[in-house]
């Protein structure tokens, strides 16, 4: 029942530490790689962890004195203890080879395998501290029930067989990567390949080409960058668009585009599971048009993470599928088909609550056991859910109009030289914060003044597509990428105050 923290980038040793902890019966506390030293100190102390497994790069920035409850700190590079405050623990570390030889004099054999069986499916397995867009981290308590249900769903829906390959590139400290890449892949007998750092789209594409994974799980940003850089430019011209409108040629172009897109991702995959953040509407429409095998999964850490998903063959455009097995999903709206309401859910995937935070738990799980996600969506008659935006992100104007910034950002992000954008409300006026694609702009000989003119042209063009109450009044150039969570969602709370 003791807590063990683990903080490092993806690696085989991360996986070993995780499995050693949960099979021993302790509670694992994965810490996201993006958390800084102060965050790590706070999580270690708040979780009352006894051991911390840490990578050498992270260890250099930590202060052991700031984590007084720890019995020991172990480097994940070679499992060497760098801090040991307990005599029994020190004894075990110093004499581990002798102790191992005494217990297994004829080496470790299959009959020695005896995993601890949890007393109850409700027993706590994981405490996962969120890194949300609101800036407040909470410890999500996931029981074995939730882990089992999520992994079981993957087995029910995905075709991975023993010996298949999976590239683990999502942070293992986040439940999306932990479940889809690691726990599901491991339990299916797949070969796991860990990308030990957050690589560029070029490195990711290279790894797909060499490893040829059977399934791919990733955040939208990765797919969008690869498709926009490698595929869309081939048809994003007058001739390409004209050919796409010709029925006979159209089918050939689609097949060619699908083949090229499949090659970028290794050609061997059954489907790409995209989740963690809103997906660009133009990129999705293109993928659907060419018959590319992608699906959108919707979930949150509090459900470990899966809430909605469907196979790519049945997925409807712009939706995130239906409620998964063992989960119920409702839209809190008088007219769920036409009027967006909050997504609420309950079922086997649900967390136990927030660690040492009963107040926050009661605010998200009601007395009837429904978890209130904070996301707004509609649901059609077949049960397909389409997320419209996040209730906390919704902008309310003085005239009473509800504006969902994600919908405007999705359009703006498809315009020339826009890398990413954020829509904020300033003095009851909509302002677009834009991080331009400087590399592309400079490669085309543009200067700062040219970029500013293009962004103003984009604003005018976009306003022609938007209703009067959604008009963008101003563009503000952002010179650095926006700060993001592990799921590559922009931390909106950091950009509410617009200067200039």
Language model region names:
Residues 1-6:
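Short, small-residue-biased leader/transition segments that mark boundaries at the very start
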Residues 23-103, 428:
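Structural core segment of the AMP-binding/adenylate-forming
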Residues 35, 52, 347, 352-353, ...:
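AMP-binding/adenylate-forming catalytic core of the ANL superfamily
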Residues 93-129, 136, 159-165:
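Conserved pre-ATP/AMP-binding loop-to-beta segment of ANL
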Residues 125-149:
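Conserved AMP-binding A3 loop
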Residues 130, 330, 337-397:
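Conserved ATP-binding/catalytic segment of the ANL
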Residues 148-165, 172-259:
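Conserved AMP-binding/adenylation subdomain of ANL enzymes
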Residues 214-217, 227-315, 419:
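Gly/Ser/Thr-rich phosphate-binding loop
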């Amino acid at each position: 029942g003791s807590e063990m923290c683990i903080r490092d980038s993806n690696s085989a040793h991360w996986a070993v530490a995780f499995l050693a902890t949960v099979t021993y019966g302790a509670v694992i506390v994965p810490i996201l790689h993006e958390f800084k030293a102060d965050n790590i100190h706070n999580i270690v102390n708040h979780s009352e962890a006894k051991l911390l497994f840490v990578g050498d790069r992270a260890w250099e920035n930590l202060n052991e004195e700031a984590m007084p409850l720890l019995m020991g700190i172990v480097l994940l590079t070679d499992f060497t203890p760098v801090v040991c405050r307990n005599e029994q623990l020190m004894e075990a570390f110093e004499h581990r080879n002798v102790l191992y030889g005494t217990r297994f004099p004829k080496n470790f054999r299959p009959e020695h395998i005896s995993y601890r069986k949890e007393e109850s499916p409700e027993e706590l397995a994981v405490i996962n501290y969120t890194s949300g867009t609101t800036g407040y981290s909470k410890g999500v308590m996931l029981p074995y029930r939730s882990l089992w249900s999520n992994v079981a769903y993957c087995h029910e829906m995905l075709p991975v067989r023993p010996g298949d390959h999976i590239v683990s590139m999502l942070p293992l400290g986040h439940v999306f990567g932990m479940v889809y890449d690691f726990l599901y892949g491991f339990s299916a007998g797949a070969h796991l390949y860990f990308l030990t750092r957050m690589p560029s789209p070029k490195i990711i594409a290279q790894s797909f080409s060499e490893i040829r994974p059977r399934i791919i799980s990733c955040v939208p940003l990765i797919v969008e960058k690869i498709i926009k850089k490698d595929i869309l430019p081939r048809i994003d011209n007058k001739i390409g668009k004209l050919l796409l409108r010709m029925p006979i040629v159209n089918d050939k172009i689609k097949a060619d585009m699908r083949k090229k897109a499949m090659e970028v991702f290794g050609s061997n995959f059954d489907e790409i599971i995209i989740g963690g953040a809103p997906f660009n509407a133009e990129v999705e429409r293109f993928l659907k048009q060419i018959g590319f095998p992608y699906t959108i999964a919707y979930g949150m850490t509090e459900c470990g993470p899966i809430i909605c998903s469907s196979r790519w063959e049945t997925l409807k455009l712009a939706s995130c599928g239906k409620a998964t097995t063992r989960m119920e999903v409702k839209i809190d709206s008088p007219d769920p088909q036409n009027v967006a309401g909050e997504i609420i859910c309950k079922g086997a995937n649900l967390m136990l609550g927030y660690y040492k935070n009963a107040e926050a738990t009661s605010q998200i799980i009601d007395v009837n056991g429904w978890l209130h996600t904070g996301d707004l969506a509609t649901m059609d008659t077949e049960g397909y859910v389409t997320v419209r935006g996040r209730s906390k992100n919704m902008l309310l104007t003085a005239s009473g109009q509800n504006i969902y910034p994600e919908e405007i950002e999705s359009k703006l992000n498809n315009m020339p030289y826009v890398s990413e954008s954020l829509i904020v409300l300033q003095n009851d006026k909509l302002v677009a914060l834009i991080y331009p694609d400087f590399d592309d702009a400079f490669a085309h000989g543009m200067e700062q003044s040219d970029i500013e003119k293009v962004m103003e042209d984009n604003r005018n063009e976009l306003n022609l597509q938007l209703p009067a109450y959604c008009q963008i009044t101003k563009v503000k150039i952002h010179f650095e990428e926006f700060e993001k969570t592990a799921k590559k969602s922009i931390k909106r709370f950091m950009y509410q105050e617009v200067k200039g």
